[in-house]
């Protein structure tokens, strides 16, 4: 016992505003050297809970990676038409009736 009357044989002494006191445990101190079945079961359950979190995080990461991979798809796009006029501007005949701007002057020549 220490000077406040608390038992310090197991080294587990707590204190409050009134002084030190020994924490009550549900362990059987004589038969199993401080081992408690409920503490062991609690530790096993806690380890299973923490172990299952690894799989949950892994599933979330794979979903995020799949979402990242889908950005930019589809890559096999077939272009069916072009906006504007096909070919180069030097090959056009500006006197043609199919030319949409035949009424306007191009490069300073009069039609």
UniProtKB/Swiss-Prot annotation:
Where expressed (tissue)? Expressed in roots, leaves, stems, flowers, siliques and pollen.
Q: Specify the CRIB domain's residue ranges.
A: 71-84
Can you say where in the cell this protein is located?
Answer: Cell membrane
Q: Which InterPro entries match?
A: CRIB_dom (IPR000095), RIC2/4 (IPR044509)
* GO CC list: plasma membrane
Which BP terms from GO are recorded?
A: pollen tube growth
Where would you say this protein principally sits, based on its record? membrane
What keyword terms does UniProt attach to this protein? Cell membrane, Growth regulation, Membrane
Source domain of life is: Eukaryota
Query: What is the topology of this protein in the membrane according to its UniProt annotation?
Result: Peripheral membrane protein
Q: How does it assemble?
A: Interacts with ARAC11/ROP1.
Q: What else is known?
A: Over-expression of RIC2 in tobacco germinating pollen reduces pollen tube elongation.
Described function: Functions as a downstream effector of Rho-related GTP binding proteins of the 'Rho of Plants' (ROPs) family. Participates in the propagation of ROP GTPase signals in specific cellular responses. Is involved in pollen tube growth regulation through its interaction with ARAC11/ROP1.
Name listed for the protein in its UniProt record: CRIB domain-containing protein RIC2
Q: Which organism is it from?
A: Arabidopsis thaliana
Which gene underlies this protein?
Answer: RIC2
